C-alpha cells in the first residue's frame, strides 16, 4: 500500500521533560520519525515542553511549539494549526495519555483529527490492565491472576486470596510509578494507598507474584498488510520483580531454547493481533517459569519505548523511523533497510554479536531513599556495549558506566544483598564467586539463570589465573578477549595502565572493529557503525583518506550530565560536516540522537575510556578530537589524550586545567583584576576548620574536579563542616576540598559565551530565580534577566570579556557569576559547552553550538553571526555592524523564556525536597511568555506543578524570610486565597492586618498541619527552611544496609506530605515572589496562548 494521500499535516506529541522512566530515547525516536515523515512529503507540527531536544529544532518540522503538554495547550495548537492526523506513539507514556484524553473529550472529533499509529481502543486495551487481561484470555494467552481494585479493603481481600507476596501496579503510570511488591499486609497498605494517588484513574492492579521467573521482551513491528517481524529478542539478566528499566539486559536472548522462542514469537503475534495494533512497533514482555516452562504475557506497550531504542541500536534496525512510515500507510516491503540500502525493512535483522545494556543509578543523590530494586524504576540512564561474546560485551558495558571507584561492598552481608538486589547487584555476584560461593548457591539467592552465572564465575577464575601468570602474553590475550580493560589487568598485576598498553603494542595485541549491519554480514552495509572486539582478525573499519574530526560523547545519562550535552554533540557533528570534515562519533549511550546510525559519518559504539578512545584514534588518525561538548566525561580523559599527543580541538587543555584548578584560577582572576568569593583549600579536618573560621560561616564546601555538585554543601557550623570534610575526602582522594565564603542573598547569573579568540559574544545571560546556593542545574532561570540595571549588564559584559580572553577560549564556555551589593563575583568558569546551551539557542533563535563548532575549526565569529543579524538587543543598544567592537552585542529577546527543572522526588519517597548545592534534577522544561510572569506560569504547568488560582494556602516561613514573605502572602490573601499558617508566621501576618487561620505544628495538638494536608484542603504550600532546621545531609555514610537518615524535622514532614499528595510547594522566597506574579497574571486572563517557536524570535 502506498502512502496515504488523505492526510497532509501531522501533529506529533513529544515526551516532555526527562524523568526516570522516560529519557532521551524519545528524542532519538521522535527525531527519526520527523525526518521520515518530512522525507515522505508530509507537513509536521511538533509539540514538546523540553527545549533540550533535537526534535524541537526548527529544521525537522514545519512548526515547532515549546508549550506545556496539557490538553488545554494542545487544543489551542490543534485549533490554530488544523492538523489532519495525530501521531501519539513517539512521545512515550505522556503522549499516549494525552491522545486518549484528547479523544475522550471529543477534541479530536471537533477538529476532524484522526489518530494514526495506534487506534484509541488499542491504546486502551494495552494500557487498561483489566481490558488487557480480558483481551489476552480471549486470545487464548495466559496472563497472571490479577484483580483491579479502587480501594484498600478490596486490595487486602485480594491479597489474602492470592497469598503474599503480591505485585501492585497502578493504572496509566510510567516506569512503575507508585507500584511495588508487598510481602505482608503492612507493606500492602502502604503501597496501595500511594498507588491509588499516583494513578490518574485511581485504580491499581493486584497481581500474583512471579518473583524469580525469567523475563523476556520481544520488539516487534507490524504493517497494515499483516506482515509481522521480530526485530530483536531481549533477555533480562535480572529475574521478574525488578523493573526492566533497572535490569541488566542482553540481546539476543541467550538462554531460550528454539522451541520456547517460537512459542513466544507466536504469542507475540497473537498479542498484537488481539490488541489491534495494525501498524508500528510494540514491545511485549513475557515471564517464563524456569521450573515448569509456564509462559505468561506480562504487558505490552503499543508505542516506541526505551526497549525499542535499545533494540534499534543493538540491531541497526530503525524502529521509530519504520513505525512512522507504517503509520502513514507504507508496508514493510516498501521501506528500504537504511543500513544495507539493498534489503527491505521486511527482513528480520540477524546479528552475529552480543549486546549488553546496564542501567546507571544515582541513589546517592537521594538520601533516605530505599536502595532496593523493585517494580518501580530508579535508574537515571543506561549504557550499551557490543562484543562477540557475552563476557566481552559485559566487560565493555561495565567500564562504560564510568563509575569512578569500585562500589564499597558490605561483605558480611553478601547473601542478604544477593537476595535483595540493589544497584550494586552485579558487584555482589562477582564478590560471591571471589569468596568461594558456587553457581548453585548464587542462583538460589538471585534467581539469575545459571548460564549467566557460569559465565561470570569463569571471569573470576580467569582473574585467579592472571594472578599466577604475571606478564604472560597468552593470558593477556585471553583477558582482552574476555572484555577485560588494560586498567583492570594492570590492577591485578600491580602495574600502571600504560605498562599494559605498551605490552600490548609490543606484542601487536590490538582490537579489530566489526560492523553492525542488521544482517550478520550477509550484505554490504552502507552506513558505517562499528564496535571493537579482540575476538576477530579482519578489521572492517577501514579509514578513508578525508580529514576527520572525532567527537567524544557524554556516555550514560546521569544527573548533572544529561541530554543537553548530546544536543550540543549532535550540532557539533553537523557543523563539522558542513565545513567539509568527516565526523567520527564515539559514545556508549543507546538512548541518544548522537548514536543514531545516520547522525555522524562513522559511529563507534564504545566505552569512553582512555584505552578505548586511543584505539579508535590509532585506527582513524583524526585531525583532532573534540572534548568540549560532552560534559565532564571527555574532559576527564583529555589529560591522558594530550599525554599521548592527541590534538584537542578548540580551547587548549592548559586553559581547561586553569579553570578546573581553583588556586590557578584565583591567580588568573587576580592578574586581570576580577573578584571571586574569598576561599581556602584544606586537606584535613583541622585545616578545614581553620579556613572556615577565617572566612566566617556560612561556607560552601566542595571537592575539586566534579560535575553536578557531587558532595557539595552549604555549612553553617563547625560540627557540620567536620562531617562533610570526611565525606568529600571520599569523592576525590588526593585532591583537597575547597571552602568558599558563601554569598548570602546574592543574585546568581549563568552566562553562555562564545569566542573565536578575538571577538567575544555573550549568547545567553540568564538570571537564576532560586537564591545563590541552589545548584544552577536545579534552579529555574530566566532569559533575558529581570533585575539587572543597564550599568550592571555593561559591567558583566566587560567582566566576561576579560575572563574569556584570559582563558583563551576558542568555542563555547560557561561562566557563573554572583552579584552582591552591585559587585560582581566570579563563581566558576567552564571552558566547555554547558547544560544551558540548548535552552539559550531556543530562546534567542541562534544555534549556539553550531557556531561554536565552526569557530573551533577556524571560522570567524562576526561572519557566522551576520547570518542572524540584526537580532533583538537591549533597549537603548544600537548596533549597525558586527565587529566594530570586540564585544559583540548580547541578544535580548522580546519574549521571556523560563527554564524550570524536573526532579524525581516522587520516585524516592523518604527524600527531603529542599534544594541545595548538590544537583538532583533529571530534566527541564521551557516556558515562553510576553513577560516574566507568563513564562514562569507556563514553565510551572509544563513541569507538572501548576500554580492554583483559588483555594487555601498553608504558610510556614523562617524568621529570616518573614520581612519579604509577609507582603507577598498578603497579596495572595487580597487575590482571594484563604491563608492557614503556623503560629509564628500567623502572628507576623496578623500584625499586617491579614486574616489568618492558625494551625498547630506537629506535636502541638490536632488537627495539625499534616492532617490539613492529608484532608486535601490546601492548594499551595509555602515553606522556607529555618536555620534551626538542619538540611538533610546529601550523602549516606556507609551505614548498615537499608537504614534511613534519622533527622526528620516538621518541615521535612510538611514538604514530603505535600509531595505525596501532589500539592504544589514553594521552598524559597524567590520562588514565592515569582509565583505571586504568575498567579496574578493567571487570574487576569488565560495564559493559554500558543506561539510557534520561530514566531517568538521575530517579535
Curated annotation (Swiss-Prot):
Region (Allosteric domain): 945-1099
Keywords, sorted A to Z: Amino-acid biosynthesis, Arginine biosynthesis, ATP-binding, Ligase, Magnesium, Manganese, Metal-binding, Nucleotide-binding, Pyrimidine biosynthesis, Repeat
Cofactor: binding details: Binds 4 Mg(2+) or Mn(2+) ions per subunit.
Gene Ontology terms: biological process: 'de novo' UMP biosynthetic process; glutamine metabolic process; L-arginine biosynthetic process
Residues reported in the UniProt entry to bind Mg(2+) 1: 285, 299
Enzyme Commission code: 6.3.4.16, 6.3.5.5
Binding site for Mg(2+) 2: 299, 301
Residue ranges of the region described as Carbamoyl phosphate synthetic domain: 542-944
Residues engaged in binding Mg(2+) 4: 828, 830
Protein origin, superkingdom: Bacteria
An example Gene Ontology CC term for this record: cytoplasm
Domain ATP-grasp as annotated: residue spans: 133-328, 666-857
Location of region: Oligomerization domain: 403-541
SUPFAM superfamilies: Carbamoyl phosphate synthetase, large subunit connection domain, Glutathione synthetase ATP-binding domain-like, Methylglyoxal synthase-like, PreATP-grasp domain
Cofactor(s) this protein requires: Mg(2+); Mn(2+)
InterPro entries per the UniProt record, alphabetical: ATP-grasp, ATP_grasp_subdomain_1, CarbamoylP_synth_lsu, CarbamoylP_synth_lsu_oligo, CarbamoylP_synth_lsu_oligo_sf, CbamoylP_synth_lsu-like_ATP-bd, CbamoylP_synth_lsu_CPSase_dom, MGS-like_dom
Job description of the protein: Large subunit of the glutamine-dependent carbamoyl phosphate synthetase (CPSase). CPSase catalyzes the formation of carbamoyl phosphate from the ammonia moiety of glutamine, carbonate, and phosphate donated by ATP, constituting the first step of 2 biosynthetic pathways, one leading to arginine and/or urea and the other to pyrimidine nucleotides.
HAMAP family for the chain: CPSase_L_chain_A (MF_01210_A), CPSase_L_chain_B (MF_01210_B)
Domain notes for this protein: The large subunit is composed of 2 ATP-grasp domains that are involved in binding the 2 ATP molecules needed for carbamoyl phosphate synthesis. The N-terminal ATP-grasp domain (referred to as the carboxyphosphate synthetic component) catalyzes the ATP-dependent phosphorylation of hydrogencarbonate to carboxyphosphate and the subsequent nucleophilic attack by ammonia to form a carbamate intermediate.
Similarity comment: Belongs to the CarB family.
The protein's name: Carbamoyl phosphate synthase large chain
Source species of the chain: Thermotoga maritima (strain ATCC 43589 / DSM 3109 / JCM 10099 / NBRC 100826 / MSB8)
Lineage: Bacteria, Thermotogati, Thermotogota, Thermotogae, Thermotogales
Gene from which this protein is expressed: carB
Amino acid at each position: 500500500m502506498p502512502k496515504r494521500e488523505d492526510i497532509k499535516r501531522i501533529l506529533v506529541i513529544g515526551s516532555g521533560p526527562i524523568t526516570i522512566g522516560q529519557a532521551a530515547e524519545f528524542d532519538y525516536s521522535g527525531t527519526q520519525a520527523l525526518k521520515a515523515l518530512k522525507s515522505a512529503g508530509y507537513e509536521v507540527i511538533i509539540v514538546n515542553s523540553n527545549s533540550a531536544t533535537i526534535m524541537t529544532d526548527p529544521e525537522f518540522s514545519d512548526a515547532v511549539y515549546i508549550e506545556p503538554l496539557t490538553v488545554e495547550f494542545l487544543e489551542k495548537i490543534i485549533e490554530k494549526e488544523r492538523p489532519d492526523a495525530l501521531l501519539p506513539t513517539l512521545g512515550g507514556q505522556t503522549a499516549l495519555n494525552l491522545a486518549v484524553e484528547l479523544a475522550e473529550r471529543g477534541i479530536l472529533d471537533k477538529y476532524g483529527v484522526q489518530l494514526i499509529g495506534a487506534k484509541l481502543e488499542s491504546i486502551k486495551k494495552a494500557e487498561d490492565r483489566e481490558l488487557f487481561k480480558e483481551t489476552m484470555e480471549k486470545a487464548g494467552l495466559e496472563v497472571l491472576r490479577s484483580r483491579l481494585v479502587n480501594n484498600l479493603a478490596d486490595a487486602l481481600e485480594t491479597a489474602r486470596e492470592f497469598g503474599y507476596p503480591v505485585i501492585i501496579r497502578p493504572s496509566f503510570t510510567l516506569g512503575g510509578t507508585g507500584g511495588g511488591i508487598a510481602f505482608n499486609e503492612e507493606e500492602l497498605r502502604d503501597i496501595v494507598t500511594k498507588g491509588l494517588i499516583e494513578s490518574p484513574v485511581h485504580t491499581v492492579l493486584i497481581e500474583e507474584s512471579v518473583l524469580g521467573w525469567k523475563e523476556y521482551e520481544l520488539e516487534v513491528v507490524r504493517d497494515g498488510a499483516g506482515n509481522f517481524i521480530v526485530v530483536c529478542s531481549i533477555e533480562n539478566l535480572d529475574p521478574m520483580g525488578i523493573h526492566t528499566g533497572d535490569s541488566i539486559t542482553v540481546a539476543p536472548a541467550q538462554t531460550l531454547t528454539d522451541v520456547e522462542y517460537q512459542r513466544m514469537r507466536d504469542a507475540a503475534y497473537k498479542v498484537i493481533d488481539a490488541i489491534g495494533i495494525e501498524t508500528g512497533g510494540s514491545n511485549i514482555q513475557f515471564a517464563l517459569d524456569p521450573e515448569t516452562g509456564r509462559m505468561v504475557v506480562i504487558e505490552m506497550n503499543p508505542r516506541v519505548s526505551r526497549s525499542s531504542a535499545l533494540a534499534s541500536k543493538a540491531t541497526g534496525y530503525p524502529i521509530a523511523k519504520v513505525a512512522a512510515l507504517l503509520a502513514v500507510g507504507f508496508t514493510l516491503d516498501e521501506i528500504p533497510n537504511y543500513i544495507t540500502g539493498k534489503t527491505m525493512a521486511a527482513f528480520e535483522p540477524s546479528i552475529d554479536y552480543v549486546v549488553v545494556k546496564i542501567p546507571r543509578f544515582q541513589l546517592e543523590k537521594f538520601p533516605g531513599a530505599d536502595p532496593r530494586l523493585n517494580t518501580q524504576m530508579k535508574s537515571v540512564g543506561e549504557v550499551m556495549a557490543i562484543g562477540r561474546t557475552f563476557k566481552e560485551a559485559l566487560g565493555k558495558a561495565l567500564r562504560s558506566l564510568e563509575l569512578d571507584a569500585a562500589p564499597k561492598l558490605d561483605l558480611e552481608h553478601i547473601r542478604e544483598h544477593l537476595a535483595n538486589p540493589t544497584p550494586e547487584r552485579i558487584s555482589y555476584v562477582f564478590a560471591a564467586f571471589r569468596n568461594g560461593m558456587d553457581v548453585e548457591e548464587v542462583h538460589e539467592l538471585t534467581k539469575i539463570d545459571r548460564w549467566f552465572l557460569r559465565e561470570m564465575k569463569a571471569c573470576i577464575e580467569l582473574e585467579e589465573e592472571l594472578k599466577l601468570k604475571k606478564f604472560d602474553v597468552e593470558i593477556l590475550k585471553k583477558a582482552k578477549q574476555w572484555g577485560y580493560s588494560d586498567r583492570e589487568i594492570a590492577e591485578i598485576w600491580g602495574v600502571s595502565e600504560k605498562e599494559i598498553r605498551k605490552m600490548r603494542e609490543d606484542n601487536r595485541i590490538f582490537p579489530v572493529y566489526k560492523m553492525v549491519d542488521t544482517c550478520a554480514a550477509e550484505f554490504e552495509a552502507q552506513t558505517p557503525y562499528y564496535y571493537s572486539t579482540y575476538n576477530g582478525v579482519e578489521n572492517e573499519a577501514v579509514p578513508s583518506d578525508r580529514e576527520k574530526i572525532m567527537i567524544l560523547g557524554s556516555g550514560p545519562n546521569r544527573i548533572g550530565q544529561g541530554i543537553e550535552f548530546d544536543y550540543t554533540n549532535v550540532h557539533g557533528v553537523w557543523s563539522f560536516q558542513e565545513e567539509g570534515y568527516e565526523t567520527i562519533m564515539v559514545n556508549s549511550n543507546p538512548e541518544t540522537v548522537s548514536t543514531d546510525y545516520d547522525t555522524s559519518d562513522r559511529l563507534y559504539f564504545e566505552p569512553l575510556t582512555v584505552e578505548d578512545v586511543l584505539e579508535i584514534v590509532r585506527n582513524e588518525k583524526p585531525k583532532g578530537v573534540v572534548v568540549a561538548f560532552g560534559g565532564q566525561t571527555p574532559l576527564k580523559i583529555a589529560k591522558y589524550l594530550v599525554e599521548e599527543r592527541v590534538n584537542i580541538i578548540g580551547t587548549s587543555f592548559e586553559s581547561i586545567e586553569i579553570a578546573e584548578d581553583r588556586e590557578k584560577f584565583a591567580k588568573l582572576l587576580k592578574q586581570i583584576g576580577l573578584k571571586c568569593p574569598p576561599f581556602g583549600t584544606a586537606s584535613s579536618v583541622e585545616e578545614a576548620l581553620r579556613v572556615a573560621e577565617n572566612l566566617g560561616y556560612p561556607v560552601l564546601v566542595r571537592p575539586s574536579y566534579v560535575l553536578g555538585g557531587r558532595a557539595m554543601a552549604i555549612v553553617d557550623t563547625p560540627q557540620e563542616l567536620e562531617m562533610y570534610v570526611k565525606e568529600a575526602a571520599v569523592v576525590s582522594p588526593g585532591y583537597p576540598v575547597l571552602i568558599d565564603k558563601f554569598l548570602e542573598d546574592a543574585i546568581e547569573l549563568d552566562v553562555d559565551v562564545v569566542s573565536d579568540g578575538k571577538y567575544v559574544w555573550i549568547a545567553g545571560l540568564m538570571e537564576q530565580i532560586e537564591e545563590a546556593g541552589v545548584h544552577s542545574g536545579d534552579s529555574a532561570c530566566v532569559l533575558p534577566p529581570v533585575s539587572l540595571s543597564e550599568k550592571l549588564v555593561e559591567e558583566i559584559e566587560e567582566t566576561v570579556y576579560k575572563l574569556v580572553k584570559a582563558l583563551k577560549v576558542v568555542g563555547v564556555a560557561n561562566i557563573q557569576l554572583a552579584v552582591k551589593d552591585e559587585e560582581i563575583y566570579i563563581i566558576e568558569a567552564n571552558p566547555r559547552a554547558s547544560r544551558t546551551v540548548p535552552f539559550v539557542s531556543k530562546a534567542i533563535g541562534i544555534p549556539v553550538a553550531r557556531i561554536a563548532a565552526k569557530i573551533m575549526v577556524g571560522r570567524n565569529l562576526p561572519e557566522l553571526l551576520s547570518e542572524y543579524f540584526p537580532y533583538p538587543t537591549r533597549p537603548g543598544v544600537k548596533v549597525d555592524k558586527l565587529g566594530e567592537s570586540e564585544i559583540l552585542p548580547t541578544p535580548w529577546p522580546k519574549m521571556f523564556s523560563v527554564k524550570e527543572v524536573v526532579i524525581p522526588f516522587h520516585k524516592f519517597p523518604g527524600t527531603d525536597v529542599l534544594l541545595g548545592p548538590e544537583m538532583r534534577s533529571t530534566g527541564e522544561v521551557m516556558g515562553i511568555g510576553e513577560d516574566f510572569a507568563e513564562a514562569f506560569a507556563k514553565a510551572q504547568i509544563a513541569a507538572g506543578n501548576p500554580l492554583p488560582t483559588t483555594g487555601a494556602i498553608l504558610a510556614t516561613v523562617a524568621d529570616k524570610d518573614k520581612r519579604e514573605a509577609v507582603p507577598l502572602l498578603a497579596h495572595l490573601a487580597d487575590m482571594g486565597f484563604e491563608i492557614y499558617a503556623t503560629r509564628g508566621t500567623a502572628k507576623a501576618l496578623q500584625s499586617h492586618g491579614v486574616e489568618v487561620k492558625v494551625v498547630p505544628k506537629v506535636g502541638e495538638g490536632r488537627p495539625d498541619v499534616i492532617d490539613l494536608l492529608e484532608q486535601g484542603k490546601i492548594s499551595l504550600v509555602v515553606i522556607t527552611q529555618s536555620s534551626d532546621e538542619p538540611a538533610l545531609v546529601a550523602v549516606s555514610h556507609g551505614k548498615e544496609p537499608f537504614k534511613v537518615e534519622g533527622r526528620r524535622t516538621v518541615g521535612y514532614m510538611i514538604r514530603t506530605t505535600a509531595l505525596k499528595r501532589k500539592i504544589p510547594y514553594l521552598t524559597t522566597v524567590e520562588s514565592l515572589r515569582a509565583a505571586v506574579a504568575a498567579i496574578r497574571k493567571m487570574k487576569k486572563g488565560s495564559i493559554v496562548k500558543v506561539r510557534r517557536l520561530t514566531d517568538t524570535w521575530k517579535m
